[in-house]
């Protein structure tokens, strides 16, 4: 399910750089799946595989390209209503993200920001990087509760935004290159940064739903059991990679560890810690994720 292109090796013990993530999610937050695509039919296929009542929010960020045009937000919403088992509306009418609803950003507007109440700020835009902007806004609003999905499209629109979602602890998923090939958005995403899921369209929606159902907002503080599990994971990564994460606060290790745990299907951090202890490859993959972004918090 996950895309792991290579396992890095390391002989250095230099302290790693950790990605900056939120330690807790905003009160009452729920997972939101942001979908970028430049093809209406692909969006229809993806959303036809969704299901109601799973408490996920959905954000559609269309990607126009020089060789293709997209319908208006109203027409796109109408097309999705015909196939999706969820209510669909435009961002102008919705105003904010809510669970169990698909919100469509107009192709001629850019999602500039999402505030703590998940209200949307849109501005007119003729720039081609609207998917990047929308993904970044979601990443900074929700952190580990954000899920980014890149589907069919040309060029690189969305690749940088997807990397930002992952850097801040969220999930990055792309449609299989076998369905679209080189020079497409999925290809750009895979060459920009690591991604977590690479699957054909028919399977992608199912795996995104499964991951989203398992997500829950972080507690205000970690339990003693969670702290102990994170310490085990840190020691295991150090043992396999020789990089020491013990100098960092456990809250800073949690997003990457939780994402890997959920992707692999482990029921608890303890179970995942045992897996990292036994599997050197997993330790290197987690090390890579922990190093994915700039600076973070040391123990005080």
PLM region spans:
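Hydrophobic (often cysteine-bearing) scaffold residues that line and stabilize catalytic clefts
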Residues: 300
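Conserved acid/base catalytic micro-environments in cytosolic active-site loops
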Residues: 2-297
